[in-house]
């Protein structure tokens, strides 16, 4: 009888502790302010040759020397192909140049990082404890203040790898922010490639930890540039080439001169003639060349595959990996998984917001 009474009391105490302890913990950790912490997931981040070396350089390196050498060899080979209607030499040479340029940057055939390239900042929050800085402490009416406020909880990631794997890491980061701030939910702001990471996260983990989501410069539904490139489609437009050169070429003497020549040529309609020359064979050559080139660079990035819209994904996959499906089985499995669990369900998922 005494034993039964003892067990009854003991079990009652155990149950009491099991019920009260979590409640006490929640009460202790919960912040009662109205400022829900914001986690910022931006777009592409720099990739360094050796993420553990603070003196490492960013890759790939588009040096003047490399571009001059490539142009010197590729232009006559393309012209030869145009005259002979045989672009096999051009395809081989262009693929070799891209492989050389991206040898330390590209992923392997399983879509995994094969070396120590990356960004050390992605691991900071795991090694240095987060602090509670979620309450507004900057003048957000100024550009600098708004910037500092936004970057308080700044999630960084390798912009090449599988978005679904990154989403798992983001989930851990969200839990860490919740714990240190005392809030049960967070706000998520995604920009550019970051909108793909948020989409993968929401598809896997839902809205339980999320108070609100903002998609800025969203590309999670795909981009025309990626749709065309991953399907071997290429068209040269004079205004587009002029704009690209102005925005992306450097400020060295060579590049400055090149930009001025391109802009002047465009104004005099000379660039249109050059583009017409390329477009006469460009469509056919692009389809013949691009799949090999893409497998030597950006085509190995699962995250970049996520920028292909759902309605063009299967066509792109079958084009890029035609004849080498077994060789790239690991990578194909990753991009198929994203398409099946995230990409093909984006419209219905966001309609439920």
Regions found by a protein language model. Give the residues of each.
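Sec-dependent signal peptide cleavage junction
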Residues: 19-32
